[in-house]
Amino acid sequence: MRTQWVELGERSYPIYIGDGVLDQGVLAEHLVADRALLVSNETVAPLYAERLAVPGAEVQSVTLHDGERYKTLQTCEQVYDALIEGRFDRSATVIALGGGVVGDMAGFCAATYQRGVGYIQVPTTLLAQVDSSVGGKTGVNHPRGKNMIGAFHQPRAVVADTGVLATLPEREYNAGLAEVVKYGLIRDPAFFDWLEAHVDALRRRDPEALAHAVAESCRNKAEVVAADEREAGERALLNLGHTFGHAIETYTDYCTWLHGEAVAAGMVMAARMSVRLGWLQRNGLERTIALLEAFGLPTRPPAIPEARFRELMSVDKKNRGGQLRLVLLRSVGDAVVTGEFAPEALTDTLVEAV
């Protein structure tokens, strides 16, 4: 088992990473009281819920529908109902067992129930293990934009059992690899090199390679969050491809494209725009496309009219004073958040996508 700490002073917490960590009793160390509510979905709960039993603790459960389209305030009411009907007080712990949708919603409910209770993330998808479970971003979607309603609320711990990824459907596994690639693109060129050299091992889910990829991704995420918890600066770099990607997800009603797939196409759009601006060498774009395609990911968005694409991007949370701000690349391993770019570079990128 590897342990990576997210250093936030008194609110620091560990990320436990490795095959079989669900069975190593780490959950019990982070329960404040002997009662917890397990929040999961209809896909994951039958597979892993029993492994989260804590000796001497009462763990109640609520099971939600699976899928991004259910990441809503209405779904959260099921969690609030379970907390209230179960008479949970502020000493309660919410345990999020599932992918990013479950983790985001359970974390948001924990942040808002009685003005805040503790929670533990137990991510069961690659995307959740390397990204959404770490950093305290919680929230739900709104019909007009992704993650528009939410709160920063750090977990007490993250338990990332890489063994559960062995049975993850290939499409979901590949979607998680998009977020892994992102860390290499924004700040870790050596990790990007390593990914290029270990495509085959990661595609076949070699346990050692997978544990390393998750650990390095979590290390990068933890370092960024420790330096900029509230996304005032560096943390916004973690959104490479997300402004384009969120527009894709919203346009397709959160039904057709997985989050990681949309991010993959969005990262390529950001790279193409960076080349147009003269910031990124064409070789950097070609390496990005080649690696994402090697991981079975889309590198072009669906056909979205330029005006509609712009409209969807205009509600992005990185924007300031009505100005669109994007994460762009200067090289592989070097990214920048900026609203200062030639407008035609964006126009040409959107038009090319259509």
Swiss-Prot record:
Family: Belongs to the sugar phosphate cyclases superfamily. Dehydroquinate synthase family.
Compartment annotation: Cytoplasm
Alphabetical list of HAMAP family matching this protein: DHQ_synthase
Superkingdom field: Bacteria
Binding-site residues for Zn(2+), renumbered to this chain: 179, 242, 259
Catalytic activity: 7-phospho-2-dehydro-3-deoxy-D-arabino-heptonate = 3-dehydroquinate + phosphate
Sample GO molecular function, one term: 3-dehydroquinate synthase activity
Gene Ontology BP terms: amino acid biosynthetic process; aromatic amino acid family biosynthetic process; chorismate biosynthetic process
Protein task: Catalyzes the conversion of 3-deoxy-D-arabino-heptulosonate 7-phosphate (DAHP) to dehydroquinate (DHQ).
UniProt remark on cofactor binding: Binds 1 divalent metal cation per subunit. Can use either Co(2+) or Zn(2+).
Enzyme Commission number(s) from the entry: 4.2.3.4
InterPro entries xrefs: Dehydroquinate_synthase, DHQ_synth_AroB, DHQ_synth_fam, DHQS/DOIS_N, DHQS_C
Record's protein name: 3-dehydroquinate synthase
UniProt keyword annotations, A-Z: Amino-acid biosynthesis, Aromatic amino acid biosynthesis, Cobalt, Cytoplasm, Lyase, Metal-binding, NAD, Nucleotide-binding, Zinc
Pathway terms, separated by semicolons: Metabolic intermediate biosynthesis; chorismate biosynthesis; chorismate from D-erythrose 4-phosphate and phosphoenolpyruvate: step 2/7
Cofactor list: Co(2+); Zn(2+); NAD(+)
Positions annotated to bind NAD(+): 66-71, 100-104, 124-125, 137, 146
GO cellular component: cytoplasm
Stored Gene3D superfamilies: 3.40.50.1970, Dehydroquinate synthase-like - alpha domain (1.20.1090.10)
